Design a protein with these regions (language model features):
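Gram-negative outer-membrane beta-barrel transporters
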Residues: 721-724, 743-834
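Outer membrane beta-barrel strand-and-loop segments of large Gram-negative receptors
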Residues: 491, 498-499, 503, 509-511, ...
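C-terminal beta-signal and adjacent terminal beta-strands/loops
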Residues: 829-836, 858-911
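Surface-exposed extracellular loop regions of Gram-negative outer-membrane beta-barrel proteins
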Residues: 201-202, 410-412, 466-468, 487, ...
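Transmembrane beta-barrel wall of Gram-negative outer-membrane proteins
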Residues: 312-415, 438-444, 450-451, 645
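Short, acidic, small-residue-rich periplasmic hinge/interaction motif at the N-terminus
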Residues: 47, 59-61, 91-93, 106, ...
Length: 911
């Protein structure tokens, strides 16, 4: 043992002796030579026998000893042992153990191992059992043997398809698409019907209009895998009928590593072009919000203070630069200290995009153009994410995990508009918007086993999310139709303005689950969960009264500093009016108490019955001010029981038939249950909640057939589903003060049904086809009283009748397996869907069918270097919207823009 240990560190010891004991150099030289004669090294690779895919995390151990090691990301291992003859044991979850006896170990000996999959040993795999796995084969085995129907995507598949974040990843899963503003649509059901968790625990959303957190906050560099379940299981909260999306962050389990990566690229129609932007306070990590004292001080004091000091620190000037390439980079480090594993990862980047010659129109019910604006949009995105993970293993199978995840996405957009309003006035506009979303999440979890029957899993998390919109600015100019000269538009003092909005949300979660094994495979599960969420929102607008300002000579919309400046504010030529009413802020809280019990029962070996029940008590409240500035409180308290049944019948070794039925709930969001007038941002729709809103309840039925190949990753899956939506919550429009206001009502009923198909096929070695598609039908009946919407019955907003994803990949190993090349084409088609609901006699505004095609190429050179080239949207597709105008029996185009083709090249070096 002494010789083996000294062998593993002999170079380090030699270095220290040379520095501190130089006069004993000769003695130590001979000592090391003598030890060298007894040192042996085994190295090689551990791969999948069929696919040749490296098995990252596979273990190799010397039988009867504590000597062992773990394969790295390339499947490579190095094991230092004494020279001699041994028995080696190679293991990897989901594969048959390989035992090789009589291995004679000498210096620098290479031995390669090929493992065969063994799904029979994984019959008891649960959905939450492998959130730390990346390997596609093992994820397929997990999917095959899971108690409930799931779909998953690992880091390796995300890399192969050029997926940069979780949002792009879930769009490749059957029946899922992403609509405008990042809203997730699953089986035709909108954002409110799904839920998102991080490592199995709920996470809050910083977007008050969306239930789900923006999924592009999670870059692929920090993600181990994504698991999607479209059927309900009672171990989760019952507020989903669309999908439960769990994001598993990476955990260090393999060989120590340090990696550095960098990418450069850009959109073809943006690179090298003139790029316009506005000045900003703050930075990528810090938002330049207005000091709260200027909001809280009396109005008379504010009028004086705003003349004494420039409280904003920014101007309305728009500057110009040349669009340079986009840059991004990431750093990763993982190391094991005995039983303690540490992982650190960080990435940051920026993106720029120009939407040129886009337009948006509004029509009357008679088909006349009410208003129309052409616009150019200049968008800059800043993204940063960091992950720290600690895992500690003790006893035989107990462990503790801690993870800290931080992400921040900021979007800075300048838009110039040119057109006419509903009064026929020709206008030009300058609009600057900055929106930042952030997430800071802490998680601590543990797993403990007692004997062969009892198992305890516990977890806790505390998350903070934020949504800031600091200093949105607008200036509107009137354009003389004859001379094209510009002047400030002075209609009602709202044409030149600033807007500030802040939202902070905190969420605390505690979760305990216990499992008891009885019989050979049967299990009883029970547990409890506590969740508390708080939200604090406020916004303020500042309107510029320009009536006293001498008419300036205006040459363009960019150079405004000669007249829209602090000097004119100080001398009284410009009056700044603050709009910060009590109704501009609200506080909200939600408390959830839940308990569940379920059993996995095998009446006979091929039939699994999972039956369970969950109880949830939800107390939700919103403190707000009504239009008369009177303080109000809106509350919703419900205690409900949610049963679920999941049946799996295994036919032969690779076929299975699954059936699921459950009852779930759809709860109103905070802003939907409080009847105050609210705008999430300036220019967005006015929203008024409904104090009479109630929960909606859903009955979900799924039938699925799965076929998995015994030899490789080939598979086929087909699913039929039906959902009965009782009292569904729908966003509707009502007339208020001569204009449309969005509100929320319980509709009569709705349905969603469809079929999903998925397949993967290896045509020949290293050449693979993938395809998934869905066809769906949705229908909802709206209340006939009070609304100004044109149709009382329609498809669900955001639902496409069909979705298709396809990919072709070729991934051979070269140079004797040292190198690997990957070439892939990834295609997506999204059918037409309702973008906005038609009102005042107009039909629905629909986004037309959209096709996208991406190309991904990568090359791994030896142990250290890898290179990648990605081209997204090869078709340079145009996004188009058309609205039905029933009175003239026509469909008119109301908006169109072209995002542009994007290319990126990058490299990664692993030390």
């Amino acid at each position: 043992m002494f010789i083996a240990n000294l062998c593993a560190v002999k170079q380090v010891k030699m270095y220290k002796q040379q520095n501190f004991l130089r006069h004993f150099l000769f003695l130590f030289f001979f000592s090391l030579l003598s030890f060298q004669a007894f040192c042996g090294v085994i190295k090689g690779t551990i791969v999948d026998k069929k696919t040749r895919e490296p098995l990252f995390g596979a273990t190799i151990q010397v039988a009867g000893t504590a000597f062992g090691t773990v394969a790295d990301r390339e499947g490579r291992y190095t094991l230092n042992v004494d020279t001699g003859t041994y028995t080696l044991i190679v293991k990897f979850v989901g594969y048959q153990d390989l035992i090789r006896e009589g291995v004679k170990v000498a210096e620098n000996q290479e031995i390669h191992f090929e493992l065969e999959p063994d799904t029979e040993t994984l019959d008891e795999v649960k959905v939450t059992a492998r959130k730390n796995l990346e390997n596609e084969r093992v994820l397929q085995v997990e999917r095959q043997n899971a108690t409930i129907a799931i779909e998953n995507m690992g880091a390796k598949e995300m890399s192969l398809k050029g997926i940069s974040n979780v949002e792009e990843g879930v769009k490749k899963i059957t029946g899922i698409s992403v609509a405008n503003a990042g809203q997730l649509i699953v089986r035709g059901l909108g954002d409110r019907y799904s839920t998102t968790t991080l490592n199995g625990l709920p996470i809050a959303s910083p977007n008050p209009d969306n239930k789900l957190i923006p999924l592009d906050l999670f870059p692929s560099a920090t993600v181990k895998n994504i698991t999607v379940s479209k059927v309900y299981v009672v171990q989760s909260f019952a507020d989903y009928s669309g999908a439960h999306i769990d994001i598993g962050t990476k955990v260090h389990t393999g060989e120590d590593f340090f990696s550095v990566g960098m990418n450069v690229g850009g959109v073809f129609n943006t690179l090298g072009k003139d790029f316009y932007y506005s000045d900003r306070e703050g930075s990528l990590l810090k938002t330049g919000n207005i000091d709260s004292k200027y909001l809280d001080m009396p109005y008379s004091s504010f009028e004086e203070k705003v003349k004494e000091k420039d409280i904003f620190g920014t101007s309305f000037v728009i500057e110009k630069k040349t669009a340079l390439p986009d840059f991004s980079g990431n750093v990763g480090w993982g190391k094991s200290f005995g039983k303690l594993n540490v992982l650190l990862s960080m990435g940051a980047g920026n993106e720029k995009q120009i939407l040129k010659d886009a337009f948006v129109k509004q029509f009357t019910a008679q088909g006349r153009v009410l208003n129309m604006f052409r616009y150019n949009s200049y968008i800059t995105k800043f993204k940063i994410a960091a992950l720290a993970g600690l895992s500690y293993t003790f006893r035989h199978s107990d462990y503790l995990n801690y993870s800290l995840f931080y992400a921040r996405n900021a979007i800075d957009e300048f838009m110039e508009r040119d057109g006419f309003d509903s009064e026929g006035v020709t206008l030009r506009g300058s609009n600057s918007v900055y929106h930042a979303y952030s997430l800071l999440n802490n998680q601590l979890s543990g797993h403990h086993e007692w004997g062969e029957r009892w198992e305890l899993n516990w977890a806790g998390s505390y998350g903070m999310t934020g949504s800031d919109e600091p200093d949105r600015r607008q200036v509107m100019f009137r354009k003389n139709e004859n001379t094209s000269k510009l002047s400030l538009f002075l209609l009602n003092q709202q044409e030149t303005m600033r807007y500030f909005g802040e939202l902070d949300e905190n969420e605390l979660v505690g979760d305990v689950k216990v499992a008891y094994r009885f019989g050979e495979k049967n299990r009883l599960h029970f547990g409890a969960t506590y969740k508390r969420k708080t939200r604090d929102f406020r916004c303020a607008s500042f309107y510029y009264n320009l009536d006293n300002l001498p008419s300036p000579e205006i040459f363009n919309i960019y150079d405004t500093d000669s007249y829209l400046n602090f000097e004119n504010v100080a001398n009284g030529n410009i009056l700044i009016k603050r709009s910060y009413q009590p109704r501009n802020r609200y506080k909200a809280e939600s408390k959830a108490y839940a308990a569940f019990a379920e059993v996995d029962f095998f009446p006979f070996p091929t039939l699994l019955i999972n039956i369970g029940v969950r109880y949830e008590q939800i107390n939700q409240s919103v403190d707000y001010f009504d239009d008369g500035s009177i303080k109000r409180k809106s509350e919703l308290k419900n205690g409900d029981i949610f049963p679920a049944l999941n049946i799996k019948y295994t036919i032969g070794e690779r076929n299975s038939l699954r059936f699921a039925v459950s009852r779930t709930v759809t709860r109103p969001a905070f802003v939907e249950m409080a009847p105050f007038l609210y705008r999430e941002s300036y220019g967005s729709a006015a929203i008024r909640g409904n104090a009479a809103i109630q929960n909606g309840y859903n009955i979900n039925v799924d039938l699925r057939y799965d076929l998995f190949s015994k030899k490789n990753n080939d598979m086929f899956s087909a699913t039929l589903y039906f959902k009965q939506l009782n009292d569904p919550i729908e966003r509707v429009q009502e007339a208020e003060g001569g204009s449309a206001v969005h509100t929320f009502r319980n509709s009569k009923n709705g349905i969603a049904m469809g079929v999903e198909v998925e397949m993967r096929k290896e045509v020949f070695k290293n050449f693979r086809l993938g395809l998934n598609g869905s066809y769906m039908y949705t229908d909802v009946k709206l209340p006939k009283d009070g609304g100004i919407y044109t149709d009382n019955q329609r498809a669900l907003q955001g639902a496409s009748p069909y979705l298709i994803n396809a990919d072709i990949s070729y991934a051979p190993y070269l140079r004797g397996g040292d190198d690997r090349m990957i070439l892939a084409l990834v295609y997506n088609v999204q059918g037409p869907r309702i973008h906005s609901v038609g009102i005042f006699g107009l039909g629905d505004n629909k986004q037309l069918t959209l096709h996208t095609l991406d190309w991904v190429g990568s090359y791994s050179l030896g142990h250290h270097w890898s290179f990648k080239l990605t081209v997204k949207d090869l078709l340079n597709s145009k996004v188009r919207f058309r609205q039905d105008v029933p009175q003239i029996n026509d469909k008119l185009e109301v908006e169109a823009f072209r995002p542009g083709t994007n290319a990126e090249i990058g490299f990664t070096y692993k030390f």
